[in-house]
């Protein structure tokens, strides 16, 4: 009986340590959420502004032959895969890699330590990924697309729906899809629309990469906080159950000792 109570006491101590760890990680994630979601919203707004510029010129005759809106001759696809830098974020990383399996013939470009580990390639950290990193990638991708090295450029990332809901998604970057409601601008562009498109498309690919990295990081932080909240609740429930079991075992041991004492005194 004594050994049983000792085992229960050790288990309670172990689970309690886990509870402290999950609470600490949850607090760290909570402290990052506002900054991460603010960065996500700003990157969304900037991307929309760049897309508006492209949509305003892309329907012009000068842009009809642009390689960026033509279907590539190559059937090869290059896909950026954005995952987290760390684990303990629920199904965040697993959902990304599950979606990536749907493109077995693609060449993957990882962003985020876990993505680099998965594809066994060097990868920048998602949390510190910025504009300079994105524009370097964008220029490299555009050159490859223009040369016909691949016909599709895409990105696998996570969409932020709410604090409780994040969804893995695939977005095609190139060829650029002209929106159905896109209208030719009444503005006169100098020197012409084709030159504007050439400049804007680099900014588009750059800002789309930045937006998806920022949004994915916000999802990672939210998923980690949710996972830590859930783990914390499970740990608290386990501690309650173990404490109840411990008290019962201890009470049983005391009762047994009293019974033995009474029996001994009667003899």
Please describe what each predicted stretch is:
Residues 1-267:
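C-terminal beta-strand-loop-alpha-helix "lid" module of Rossmann-like NAD(P)-dependent dehydrogenases
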């Amino acid at each position: 009986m004594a050994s049983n109570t000792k085992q229960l006491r050790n288990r309670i101590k172990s689970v309690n340590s886990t509870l402290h760890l999950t609470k600490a990680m949850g607090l760290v994630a909570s402290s990052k959420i506002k900054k991460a979601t603010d960065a996500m919203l700003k990157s969304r707004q900037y991307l929309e502004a760049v897309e508006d510029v492209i949509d305003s010129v892309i329907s012009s005759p000068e842009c009809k032959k642009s390689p960026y809106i033509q279907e590539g001759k190559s059937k090869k696809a290059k896909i950026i895969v954005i995952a987290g830098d760390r684990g303990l974020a629920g199904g965040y990383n697993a959902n990304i890699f599950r979606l990536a399996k749907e493109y077995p013939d693609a060449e993957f470009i990882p962003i985020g330590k876990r993505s680099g580990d998965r594809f066994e390639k060097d990868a920048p950290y998602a949390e510190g990924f910025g504009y300079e990193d994105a524009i370097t990638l964008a220029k490299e991708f555009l050159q490859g697309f223009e040369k016909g090295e691949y016909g599709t450029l895409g990105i696998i990332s996570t969409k932020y729906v709410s604090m409780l809901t994040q969804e893995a998604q695939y977005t095609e970057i190139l060829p650029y899809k002209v929106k159905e409601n896109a209208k030719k601008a009444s503005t006169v562009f100098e020197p012409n629309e084709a030159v504007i498109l050439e400049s804007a498309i680099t900014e588009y690919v750059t800002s789309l990469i930045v937006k998806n990295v920022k949004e994915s990081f916000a999802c990672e932080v939210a998923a980690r906080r949710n996972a830590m909240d859930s783990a914390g609740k499970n740990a608290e429930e386990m501690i309650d159950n173990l404490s109840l079991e411990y008290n019962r075992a201890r009470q049983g041991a005391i009762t047994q000792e009293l019974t033995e004492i009474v029996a001994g005194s009667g003899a």
